[in-house]
C-alpha cells in the first residue's frame, strides 16, 4: 500500500502502532476539563478475569448535552480516569473520585448504575458548596424492575428451566436454528428481549407448519422439543408487554436526556400502556418507570438538563473489548492506555499536537503507575522468577 501511495517509508510494525496509540491515549487523558466547567461524570466497572475490574470514569460538559431528539456524541466525551483493581469498596471508589476532583474539579452530576460503591462516595463531591447530584442509569433500573416483576415468579423460573433444557436438546439437530440465544447470568434482565423475541419466533413456526424454516422438520419433532412454549403463551404476552414498555422508554431517554418536563413527556409517550387495566403487566411497568423518571427529575435545579443513560459508556467498553480481542483472556494489559483514543477522531493535527506533550517515557511511567499488579504482570513475574533460577 505504501508503494502504491508513493510513500518512501517502511510499513509500521504492529508494536509501533500500539505504542503510538498508547502515547496518544495517555496524552488525551491529560486534556480533559478544568474546575470552572460544569461537568457530568459517568462511572462504571468492567470485569475481565477473576477479581480484576477497571473503574472507568468518562465525562462531558453539561453545555455539550445534545438537544432533544439527538443522542450523545462520543466526540463530546472524554475519558477522565482508568483505574484497574481487585477490590472496589466504597472507600476505594471515594479515593479515586477525590483524586480526579482535585485534578479537574468535582462534577455537577454523577451518573452510575446504582451500585452502592459507586453511588455513596459521591456525597463527598462538593462543587460551589453543593453536593454532586447522583443519578441512576435508567437501563439498569428497568432491568431491576423486570427482575422483580417477572424474574422472581415461579412461572418464569419454570420457563428458564425449559429454555436451558431446550438448548441441550436441539443443538446439533435439524432443529438447531431454533436454539434459544445464550444469556449471561449477571445481565440476564438487561438482555431478556432477545429471549422473548426468540419465543415469539418459535411460537410463529409452531403455529405455521407451512413455514420455510420447518422444512425437513416433522410435526412430531418440533412439538416434542419446542411445544412446551404453548403452555407459556399467556405469560409471554405479559412479559412482552414489560419489555416493550422498557424498549420504548430507553429509546426515548437516549434521545431526550433528563429535563424538567421529562415526566410529562414520558407519560404522554406511554399513554396507551398507562390506560390498560390495572392488573396488566405493561401498565405496572409503565407506572414504575414514570415514577423513576419523576424522582430523577425532581433532583434537577430549575431549568437544568442532565442525562439518564450510560449506554454510550457501555458502547465504549464494547469498543475496547474489540480492540483487546484475545488479550482480554489474560486480564487487563497496557492496551488500557489506548482507551481514551476510542472517543476521538484521530487526525494528523491531533496526533502532532498531543505528541508534543507526551513522550514514550511518559507512557511507560503511566503503565507503571496504573498497571503495577495486574494478572498479566503477576503471571509474567512468576515466569521470570522460575526461569531465572535455571
Locations of the language-model features?
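RNase H-like nuclease fold core
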Residues: 3-110, 116-132, 151-152, 166-169, ...
